[in-house]
Amino acid sequence: MKNKFFITLFACLLPWMAGAQQTIFKQNNVAEKDYIAYLFTYFTGNHISEEAVCYAVSTDGYTYWALNDNKPVIDSKIISSTGGVRDPHILRCEDGKTFYMVVTDMVSDNGWDSNRAMVLLKSTDLVNWTSSIVNMQKRYAGQEKLKRVWAPQTIFDPEAGKYMIYWSMQYNGGADVIYYAYANRDFTDLEGEPKPLFIPENKKSCIDGDIVFKDGIFHLFYKTEGHGNGIKVATTRSLTSGQWEEQPDYKQQTPEAVEGAGTFKLIGQNKYILMYDVYMKGKYQFTETTDLKNFKVIDSEVKMNFHPRHGTIIPITRAELKRITDKWPSKEMGNMTIPNNPVLQGFHADPEILYSHQTKKYYIYSTTDGQPGWGGWYF
């Protein structure tokens, strides 16, 4: 009787358990605990051979090693209309497994007012990328006076449920203005006409926008142009509301000219890094903050075996780190220690390890953990 009752109960629970498993496995977003390293995307200079996407990695957010011996990992001639790209910005999508990158389609030797396009790239492995060129003058009517298209970036807009691309444009006789448009579903083109995202109260130029979302607020870091050049911040709770609160002070911690702000959160910490290019001095500065308002220089803690220009940093998993370092090894990476714990990603408990003499392999069995009510539905 007891066995019959157990079989009946188990049969009744099977559909519910299957549903629970589907719920678990559909959640593809990567938890912060699964990140073990950082990927730095950057370019290196103003020669056409240096205007290309490069990779570097770090396991602590402070010491970085260039991959592929600081040579490009993507061929600019293949993806761009000019033969060069600058200002790479990389974003992990909401699904946790897709990556978007946007770059300025430009060769600086052609002049700072020479480019009209950006490149949209998409990848699921950080190695293989598909790309699309968006030329503003060809894509939209009435763009005859457009002079330049600079430093695109991407962010997910939760209100629209879409990915917003924002960048600066300048027209003859006007100021540089940060515009936005939403990407299409395939991330190959823009939807609708570009609209102004942010115009400072003084109506003067601003470029190199970098948006960070923290505590329900979007923080826009941007470079002022022509009036005490530097990095300022404006905040809003809604990206397209037009309601921005500007902070009056400059955020760079140097009297030298800077550009290309990039901000990222340190894994497992309530700390953020604001980095920028001290471009007139050939330096790159890192600063640290907990509130995105007050910053301190941490240059003495930062080490790189390369010199980056404008770039961005995202956290990556162990599998992603292994994939890109296997593809583009570096001679100097022998000095980098890759964390080996945890050995299983996700929440696990009660592990047991067995060795099979038949297969000559070790097997680890664990119960799942981390579910509401101390629940676990599979092992």
Predicted features by range, described:
Residues 1-26:
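Bacterial Sec-dependent N-terminal signal peptides
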Residues 21-379:
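Carbohydrate-active catalytic/glycan-binding domains of CAZyme proteins
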